[in-house]
Amino acid sequence: MKIGILGGGQLGRMLIQEALKYDDEFYILDPSANCSCANISYFTQGNFNNKQEVIDFGKDKDVVSIEIEHVSVEGLQVLENKGVKVIPNSRIITIIQQKILQKQFYEEFDIPSPAFQVIQSSDEEIVIGFPFVQKLNTGGYDGKGVQIIKAEKDLVNLWDAPSVLENLVDIEKELSLIIAKNEQGEIKSFPVTEMVADPQLNLLDFNISPTQIAEDIQKQIDQIAEKFMKAANSE
């Protein structure tokens, strides 16, 4: 099977390394010739945000996937129409790319998430209470495009762009769960990890696994994960 991956970073490398036990060929599209995947795959240097380059790269592949969400959805939609299997599908990637769509997705499927307000510009009336977090609708990555507005005096710093304004959550610990599903409907959950972030950079510093959580918390995580999988399958 010929598997194409948009993006050649560390996540792509880990994916390929784990899959080397299978008889598949892996192809990478990435703008950097020195990306992490370049020396363990069939490498194509190119722009995964360019519609035509994504189409040209993926048209002869059996499966196309991503290791970064900032890719050309339009290109992936064309590939789907040509019969190429895109995982995750272009509809889910569209939701992943836009914070507003993410929040609306959670709301539609009753997936727990902090209260929020959507704005298109900084001129709109702010009705959500302080403190809140502003998250730019698109383009945020690795701590960028996110800021905390603590009080009314800080509104002068509000970015003038489509955004989600979200209640600031008093976090005890941040947990992460990876869950996978195959075409037969089998679901595999990997161990929950605790994510420890750098408070200044808003970047992941390190992960703790196994994490120490109560049984009732684990049950809530499992229920939310199951609800999310069902919602994603409906898209």
Residue ranges and their predicted role:
Residues 27, 65, 86-87, 133, ...:
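Structural detector of well-ordered beta-strand residues that form the stable sheet scaffold
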Residues 51-60, 123-128, 156-157:
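Short amphipathic alpha-helix with an adjacent loop that forms part of the alpha/beta core around
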Residues 43-48, 117-121, 149-150:
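Short acidic-hydrophobic, aromatic-tinged amphipathic segments that line or gate anion-handling sites
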Residues 145-235:
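Internal nucleotide-binding/catalytic subdomain
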Residues 1-92, 96-97:
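ATP-binding N-terminal substructure of ATP-dependent carboxylate-amine bond-forming enzymes
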Residues 69-71, 137-139, 180:
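Short glycine-rich anion-binding loops that position phosphate/pyrophosphate groups of nucleotides
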Residues 89-146:
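A conserved helix-loop-beta module that forms one wall/lid of the active-site cleft
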